Structures are given as structure tokens and as C-alpha cells.
Amino acid sequence: MSHKIMAINAGSSSLKFQLLAMPQGEMICQGLIERIGMSDAQVTLKAPAQKWQETLPVADHREAVTLLLEKLLSHNIISSLEEIDGVGHRVAHGGESFKDSARVTDETLAEIERLAELAPLHNPVNALGIAVFRQLLPKTPAVAVFDTAFHQTLDEPSFIYPLPWRYYSELGIRRYGFHGTSHKYVSAQLAEKLGVPLSALRVVCCHLGNGSSICAIKGGHSVNTSMGFTPQSGVMMGTRSGDIDPSILPWIALREGKTPQQLNQLLNNESGLLGVSGVSPDYRDVEHAADTGNHQAALALTLFAERIRATIGSYIMQMGGLDALVFTGGIGENSARARAAICHNLNFLGLAVDEEKNQRNATFIQTENAVVKVAVINTNEELMIAQDVMRLAISETVTLGIPA
């Protein structure tokens, strides 16, 4: 039996969605409402053979959700709201409370709101999206899917920071990790494509985009990941610095009189590829600048690759070897240059990339005799969310090959 499942990603001023037919995973419709709260909000809906765009005022998220449901009806995507069998919501932070996705209840929603102190930019609007859908579709089961849940299998040496213990025990400061939904989906897809149980593999997954994170996956479980207490830490990103010497921050604060909020702006929005290149946070723009002789742009590309290489190396040490390296995300899926730079001169690991396969974005890009598989796999977080709705709310398991 086919079920219509909606996957929702609510941002501070946007609402992204997909409506999927499950368990087959076919996209029925997808769309985005941008500039929520403005008089010129952009509404875009796409079905396999059609596209609709409109500009109109959208006051808030409740109005956005109402508009979305109205558009699905008016464009005959669905004939009634009762056709929507379940809704899955992406939630940024589940803290230590959620080790898996969870059915939405009053208690679940309250805990998501409480965890807003760990993700003040994301959890409040995620909770708002859940609340609005519950009001408008009160009989439709909902599931919260947490970016952090996949990383709850990290052991203490991998998640504890070397700070006074009370900062963990009282304030919950620890490595949480993010992009978990993507890492979980891509690693399962890898195992399926290899025809090998995920439980038998040691994998490093590189989710590379404007936000980037690396994840070590052993036996199907996350054992380490580069993002930490916040999505700011780890490798260099589009506008985020990733890991730096922490004493730089008080030094800058004293020298330039910056507030904590200004320092956060510096680290999150003015650093990374943009900060070093002085050109753009977009990897493609930095590539172009580097090719026209811009030294800072070329340096930014080198830094980006070297930080990732160092992280991969540490994870290989932790897992005692490597069976597969996987690239996903906007840069990981589309930039042959980035993949080549990250995999350069790793023959000593039994890892080598075939240039022709890499240039055409083949699924497997390793050379014929390479020991380590190198894969390029498109992530699909919306499908992963829909699969969790099926598993937890519709009581139909979609097999992903992920160990329990």
C-alpha cells in the first residue's frame, strides 16, 4: 500500500518540503516558500512535469503552512488533506534526549523547545513548524527527525571536551555533531551499492557544502564527527572557520572591542572560504578566482582540502583502517576538483582516484586496483525523513541496511 508522506524543513524565514509516495520513495511534489514575514515572499512548487511560482505576502509560518496545503489542493497534487498519511520534521538539535527520531507528542515538542538553548537559531523555528502542522493536520501522525541523533553512538572519549567536568554535567557542553540524517542515509546507500552489510564496513563520509562535516562510521554507527557543540566547529566551510585556536577570540575581542555576538558573526558568517579568499563563500566562485590567478582563492581551496584530509586521517586511525570514502553534499557531489584534492597522494592507503570517473561524477571513482572504495552519492535527507515516518508512525519498515 502506498502512503503520502510529507518531509518538512522549516527555516527562520523559509519552509522547504517534499511530498513523497512511500515506500517506493517517489517524489510527488516539492517546493519552497522563501522570505516568510515579507510582502514579497516567493512560493515555488515543482511536480515531475510542472512548476508553479508566485510572489505574495506571507506573514508568518502558520500562513506559510496554510498556503502550502492550499496550493497542494488547488494544483490537484492531492484531492484532500486526509491523503497526507504522515509528516516528518527535520529538527536541528535533539541533545542527549533523542537517540533516534521520535513520534511527535506534547512531551516531544516541549523537549524540542527546551533544547532551543543548544540551538537558538534552529530549534525554535523547527518547533514552530511542528506546532503549526499539528494545528492544521491534527489527525495526521508526525515524526521529529534530529540532525544530532545519529551521532548519539559516540563514546565519551569522542564527545567529551577537555573542559572542567561541570560544563558537561551541568550545561551539556559536549560534541553533538550534525548532518546525521545525511550521513546515515549516504552510508546505507553505500552498503547497498556495494552489496555488503553496513555492519561490516569502516566508512568516512564527507558531507561537503556551505556547511561541511566529516563522519567516521564503523559497523553502521557514528563513532566520530567533525562538527561539535555547534555546527561551527570542525573543517573549514563556506562562511564558517571550523576549528581555530580558541585564544584567538579573546585576543580579537580585546584588540578590536568585539562583543560575543560580533565574534559569533565573525566565525559563522565572515570566515571560511569567504574569509580567506575575499571572493565568495561559494566553492565554484573561489575555483574561478583561483584559476584567474587569485592567490588567496587558491590558498582557500588548499586549506579546505587539507583540513578535510587531516580529519579523514584521524578517523582512519580511530577505526583501524578504511573500507570506503564517500562524498556527498553540494560540493562533494559536484566538484571533481575538491574530490581530487582531498584524495591526492593517498596511494599508501590503497586509495586512488580515476581521473576520468571523477570528472564525470561516477558513483565509484576509485582506480581499478584501489583497495579503498571512493564513492559519490547524492544525499536525500527528505527521503530519510519519510522513511523514519514510515518506520515510526505508519508501522511499515523501509529497509536501509542500518544496524539497530
UniProtKB/Swiss-Prot annotation:
Where is this chain's protein located in or outside the cell? Cytoplasm
BP GO annotations: acetate metabolic process; propanediol catabolic process; propionate catabolic process
CDD domains according to UniProt: ASKHA_NBD_AcK_PK
**E.C. designation(s):** 2.7.2.15
The answer to whether UniProt assigns keyword Cytoplasm to this entry is yes
Mind telling me which Gene3D superfamilies this protein's record contains? 3.30.420.40
Residue ranges of coiled coil: none
Q: Which UniProt keywords apply?
A: ATP-binding, Cytoplasm, Kinase, Nucleotide-binding, Transferase
| Family affiliation | Belongs to the acetokinase family. PduW subfamily.
UniProt cross-references to NCBIfam families, sorted A to Z: ackA, PRK12397.1
Task: Please give the HAMAP family that the UniProt record associates with this protein.
Answer: Acetate_kinase, Propion_kin_subfam2
| Predominant place of localization | cytoplasm
Taxonomic lineage is: Bacteria, Pseudomonadati, Pseudomonadota, Gammaproteobacteria, Enterobacterales
Under what name is this protein listed? Propionate kinase
- One Pfam annotation, family name? Acetate_kinase
Q: Which domain of life is it from?
A: Bacteria
Q: Does Oxidoreductase appear among the keywords?
A: no
Origin species, per record, is: Citrobacter freundii
What reaction(s) does this enzyme catalyze? propanoate + ATP = propanoyl phosphate + ADP
Outline what the protein does. Answer: Works with phosphate acetyltransferase (pta) to capture exogenous propionate and regenerate propionyl-CoA during degradation of 1,2-propanediol (1,2-PD). Expression of a cosmid containing the full 21-gene pdu operon in E.coli allows E.coli to grow on 1,2-propanediol (1,2-PD) with the appearance of bacterial microcompartments (BMC) in its cytoplasm.
Question: What is a single molecular function from GO for this protein?
Answer: acetate kinase activity
A single GO cellular-component term from the record reads: cytoplasm
Q: Specify the pathway.
A: Polyol metabolism; 1,2-propanediol degradation
SUPFAM superfamilies from the UniProt entry:
Actin-like ATPase domain
